[in-house]
């Protein structure tokens, strides 16, 4: 996974300490050419949301030519699981679950628990696909997904296979 050392590379990562040195080594990217956007789960939940906006600004203002969406292998957001168990949240979650299940446009189906604790491999694949097919992302920008696996004490990196959906927006946006 050799990256041209003179070009800017954007990493959308999970909020986890210690990923930058691992990614620099794995992608052969120097610190001065590395830009990082951190979010819980390294996910882009909406094609016109704040994280996607930051990605687009990075592409045009920093001349980013390659983007890596980086997740931690099979990690689930433990904080999300804790939120759904709080007694003070139960009424709010019940209301939101109703909205999720009745597919209001701003909610993409499922439950609050599924939304908060989405599988990291699915999240990374969807985010990569959303960036690749976004109308404001130039075709020359390479977008790849990576998983960092910390099993065995030594981190390993695996590339996410390409998703073949070709659809970056939810179905309700296409009708």
From Swiss-Prot:
Domain of life: Bacteria
GO molecular function ontology, one term from the record: carbonate dehydratase activity
Coiled-coil region list: none
Family membership noted in the UniProt record: Belongs to the beta-class carbonic anhydrase family.
Protein name, per record: Putative carbonic anhydrase-like protein YbcF
Biological source species: Bacillus subtilis (strain 168)
Lineage: Bacteria, Bacillati, Bacillota, Bacilli, Bacillales
